[in-house]
Regions:
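Positively charged n-region of N-terminal signal peptides that target proteins for export
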Residues: 1-8
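Bacterial N-terminal signal peptides
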Residues: 8-20
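Predominantly soluble domains enriched in secretory-pathway, periplasmic, or organellar proteins
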Residues: 18-378
Length: 378
């Protein structure tokens, strides 16, 4: 029997290519309307880019790493930042006097001209607000408007009822109403990760294929789940993530690595060991040999958080190290892969050494960060 994979806890981080060692630059959203630019070498904010359309809720890098796309909350805005000049080159809002949109994520096409997302339209009537169905949406950045919408198959009258609903909010390109998007290297197909992987035609969202993701060579499993974002690995179109599953008898949970090829549409699973209560997404070093995740066990005063280092060449857990838990937090990695970051919600980024897992510094940003993700560039 095949056991389907459910994508959850989608978080947005840029998929990094190979980068040289040395300090990089971080971009993150902050209240009330900023994108902060942080120099890794100095450990401080070196620039603040004001968003004209409101509070940043998601942030994503283009395929060529030259442009950053930001979605904002106040009026369902979209802003485009040029990385070199750190200037906003384009901004607009989708809302008007009688229509509002719940905009979830935004995955750019390879040319950086379109954003693929899911939206829900809220129409103001004379005596009520009418909430429409969740729709696949193409946003034309040059024309500053929605170019095409298509009803999502299986969507109910509200966004929450969409088939394969994934993590809420901005990070991964889909969010509530359908899970995260990945765009194929040639820009012709979209991959939507939910209870199945749905392959869509990027031009009209017609379904090309539905991939039922089964655990190979392990027939006695249930509740197979893919956690966190899909990180880039060495070859174009290759992605890797954490997965977990449980056996159907005593329900012991196991985690491991899942690799997905966007070109061949094939998955490969490698179990590693017993799964903790919760895990963040996997972050990969520039040489693609090591990956890091954060595990959480317990609750309240008994909560325990650990960094886990994974050798991607052997798919083995090689190192662990405990750090002080936060009630809410996100996890990131530096441009050279030598530092690990614990950040949000709050004003500070805690910096840890990726080899020893020892705390090295606390960066005070002077602004409360949003949960929209972190873009890391060399």
């Amino acid at each position: 029997m095949k056991h389907l994979i459910a994508l959850r806890h989608l978080i947005i981080l840029s998929c990094l290519g190979a980068v040289s060692a040395g300090a990089g630059t971080l971009f993150c959203g902050a209240y009330p309307y900023w994108v902060l630019v942080i120099d890794e070498g100095q450990g401080k904010v070196t620039d603040r880019i004001r968003m004209e359309t409101g509070l940043p809720t998601s942030i994503r890098i283009s395929h060529d790493h030259k442009t950053i796309f930001v979605t904002t909350n106040d009026r369902s805005g979209i802003e485009v930042i040029d990385v070199a000049t750190r200037k906003v080159t384009n901004h607009f809002v989708l809302n008007d006097a009688t229509h509002k949109f719940r905009l979830n994520g935004g995955a750019p096409d390879p040319d950086g001209k379109l954003l693929y997302a899911t939206t829900t339209q809220i129409t103001k009537q004379a005596d009520r607000y009418e909430i429409g169905k969740a729709k696949y949406t193409i946003i034309d950045l040059a024309q500053q408007k929605i170019g095409k919408t298509v009803d999502m198959p299986g969507a109910n009258d509200t966004a929450g009822g969409a088939e394969g609903g994934g993590a809420a909010g901005g990070g991964g390109g889909g969010g509530r109403g359908g899970g995260g998007f990945e765009v194929s290297p040639d820009g012709k197909f979209l991959y939507q990760f939910g209870s199945t992987v749905t392959v869509l035609n990027a031009a009209d969202f017609s379904v090309v294929e539905r991939i039922q993701l089964a655990q190979p060579d392990a027939p006695a499993v249930e509740n197979l789940g893919l956690g966190g974002l899909l990180e880039a690995v060495s070859d174009p179109g290759q992605r890797v993530s954490i997965f977990n599953y449980s056996d159907p008898i005593v329900h012991n949970r196991v985690f491991g690595l899942a690799r997905f090829d966007l070109n061949t549409r094939k998955f490969d699973f490698t179990p590693i060991g017993p799964a903790p209560v919760a895990m963040t997404g996997l972050h990969v070093t520039p040489d693609k040999k090591s990956g890091y995740t954060v595990s959480t066990n317990g609750t309240g005063g008994n909560k325990r958080c650990e960094f886990w280092g994974i050798d991607l060449t052997t798919s083995r857990l090689t190192r662990t190290g405990e750090f002080p838990c936060r009630t809410r937090y996100s996890f990131g990695i530096s441009a050279d892969g030598k530092k690990l970051y614990i950040y949000g919600a709050g004003y500070e980024i805690e910096v840890y050494d990726a080899v020893t897992f020892k705390h090295e510094a606390t960066w005070d940003l002077g602004n409360d960060m949003t949960g929209g993700g972190l873009v890391v560039l060399p």
